[in-house]
C-alpha cells in the first residue's frame, strides 16, 4: 500500500493499475473455480440452499448472472478449464477484457492482443 502512495507519474499509475487489474482477473478465475466446486460437490446443500446461485446470492450478494459469468471465465481461461490458476496466455488481460472476450470464438480470442482495449474487443464482437 505504501508503494502506491509514492507514485508520482502517470506512467507509474499505469503500471500499478495494470498490476492490480491483473490481480482482479486472477480473482475472477478463483471465484469461478470456487463456485464450480460448490456446485459440483453440492456444498450449498450443507446450509439448505437449493443451488449454487441461491448460495452465492444469499451469502455474497452475487447475482445469478455474475455467478454464471465467473464460472464461464473459469471454464474459458483457467488451466485445463477447471483450476484456480489462469492460463499463462491470458495473464495481463484484465477482468473486463476477459469478460468481453467470452463471446468471441476461441480462434478469435487467441489472437486478441493484450493491449487491445475493451472498446476494440466490442468492435470485433459486432463484426462477428
Where are these regions (language model features)?
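N-terminal acidic-hydrophobic amphipathic loop/helix motif that frequently occurs adjacent to catalytic
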Residues: 1-60, 75, 79, 104-115
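Positions that flank functional sites
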Residues: 72
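DNA-binding alpha-helical recognition surfaces that contact promoter or target DNA
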Residues: 69
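Amphipathic alpha-helical oligomerization/scaffolding segments
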Residues: 77-128
Amino acid at each position: 500500500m505504501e508503494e502506491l502512495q509514492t507514485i508520482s507519474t502517470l506512467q507509474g499509475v499505469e503500471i500499478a493499475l495494470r498490476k492490480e487489474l491483473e490481480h482482479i482477473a486472477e480473482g475472477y478465475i478463483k471465484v469461478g473455480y470456487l463456485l464450480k466446486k460448490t456446485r459440483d460437490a453440492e456444498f450449498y446443500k450443507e446450509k439448505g440452499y437449493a443451488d449454487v446461485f441461491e448460495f452465492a446470492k444469499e451469502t455474497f450478494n452475487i447475482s445469478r448472472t455474475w455467478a454464471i459469468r465467473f464460472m464461464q471465465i473459469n471454464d474459458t481461461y483457467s488451466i485445463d478449464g477447471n483450476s484456480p490458476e489462469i492460463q499463462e496466455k491470458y495473464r495481463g488481460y484484465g477482468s473486463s477484457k476477459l469478460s468481453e472476450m467470452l463471446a468471441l470464438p476461441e480462434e478469435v480470442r487467441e489472437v486478441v492482443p493484450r493491449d487491445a482495449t475493451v472498446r476494440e474487443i466490442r468492435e470485433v464482437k459486432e463484426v462477428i
